[in-house]
């Protein structure tokens, strides 16, 4: 068969047809294009799955390889105004814009770039910052979905403060000089107790047990002493010896120690001991301004190195910034995760309304709201 355009020939051979060379070549080209289309469709499906998985990871916590893969391009990536600002203390950089794939490293820098009504999302990790939200209404600061975000107000004595503990003395006490003021000590994030008498611990909650306070002899009827004085009532059976007995056994000089005294029911005061009468077991203190009632006096002593006599007790010498600590079981303090609290607040809010802090935990620090109407602080755990 021959058509008028002279493009196709069909020659009968038996019961079938055979295409000529021009027909074969065009059909081969068509099949080749079809194969390419199938390959392209398959690649698009695979890329879509990879993109979806990557996006889902990005909404939880960036892994090192995620950031490494995008980090080289982050200098050219910009964040659209009104979209969330992301922060990652581990993998982020303050040189980046704060997108989900190119997060900032600090909340401080995110706040610098934020305006009212913005949302700042923090990826998982521990943050040590001291920032202030000022004049930014309706700002949201929250943890990423499923992420544990902790603002930590402590610093490692060895890693952050470069402290080196000295050799233990005969009592197992080591010393280190701190380059920053600290007012709480933690071992592996467990609070250690300031050196005190009678001894008590946080670990067994005896610090909250009234039996682990010493008592005065004053009652409603005996007028045993007056304001500015306190006479120790002696041993507490099964708990502690009396102050006089302790002094006689150890040589402790109570003068200069801090007496934490409950002298007025629900009111407690701390005063330095200024004098000691060993004849009747009475010490003196400045009674000005103390809440005083003639009943149920209790107290304990702290604030002297000589009071360190139990594992986990510590004392800080303000005169030379030296921390003294008796390690558990004679361990070397240089090998322990010892941290000191160095800040009262991590996040402050002032001159701003409607600010929300959500899903963020705090250890050894907290938040401070001032002049903040309609602000909220939700789904958070605060320790120490």
Specify the residue positions occupied by each region the protein language model found.
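Secretory targeting signatures
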Residues: 1-69
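Boundary/junction segments of secreted and surface-exposed precursor proteins
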Residues: 55, 59-89
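Extracellular polysaccharide-degrading/modifying enzymes targeting complex plant/algal/animal polysaccharides
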Residues: 75, 79-384
């Amino acid at each position: 068969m021959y058509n008028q355009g002279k493009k196709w020939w069909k020659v009968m051979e038996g019961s079938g047809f055979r295409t000529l060379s021009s027909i074969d070549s065009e059909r081969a080209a068509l099949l080749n294009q079809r194969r390419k289309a199938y390959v392209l469709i398959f690649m698009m499906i695979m890329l879509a799955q990879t993109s979806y998985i990557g996006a889902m990871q990005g909404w939880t916590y960036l892994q090192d390889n995620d950031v490494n893969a995008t980090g080289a391009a982050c200098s050219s990536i910009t964040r659209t105004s009104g979209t969330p600002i992301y922060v990652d203390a581990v993998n982020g950089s303050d040189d980046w814009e704060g997108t989900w794939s190119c997060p900032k490293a600090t909340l401080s820098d995110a706040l610098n770039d934020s305006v009212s009504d913005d949302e700042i999302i923090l990826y998982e990790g521990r943050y040590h910052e001291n920032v202030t939200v000022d004049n930014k209404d309706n700002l949201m600061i929250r943890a990423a979905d499923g992420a544990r975000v902790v603002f930590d107000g402590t610093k490692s004595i060895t890693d952050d403060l470069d402290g080196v503990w000295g050799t233990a003395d005969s009592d197992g006490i080591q010393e280190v000089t701190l380059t920053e003021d600290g007012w709480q000590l933690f071992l592996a994030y467990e609070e250690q107790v300031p050196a005190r008498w009678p001894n008590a611990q946080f670990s067994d909650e005896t610090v909250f047990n009234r039996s682990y306070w010493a008592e005065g002899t004053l009652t409603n009827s005996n007028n045993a002493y007056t304001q500015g004085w306190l006479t120790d009532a002696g041993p507490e059976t099964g708990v502690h010896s009396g102050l006089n007995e302790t002094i006689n056994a150890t040589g402790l000089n109570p003068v200069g120690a801090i007496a934490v005294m409950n002298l007025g029911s629900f009111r407690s005061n701390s005063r330095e001991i200024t004098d000691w009468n060993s004849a009747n077991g009475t010490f003196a203190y400045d009674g000005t301004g103390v809440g005083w009632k003639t009943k149920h006096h209790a107290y304990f002593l702290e604030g002297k190195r000589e009071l360190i006599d139990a594992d986990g007790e510590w004392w800080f010498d303000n005169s030379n910034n030296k921390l003294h600590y008796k390690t558990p079981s004679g361990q070397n303090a240089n090998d322990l995760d010892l941290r000191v609290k160095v800040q009262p607040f991590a996040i402050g809010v002032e001159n701003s309304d409607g600010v929300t802090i959500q899903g963020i935990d705090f250890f050894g620090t907290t938040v401070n709201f001032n002049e903040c109407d309609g602000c909220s602080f939700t789904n958070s755990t605060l320790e120490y």
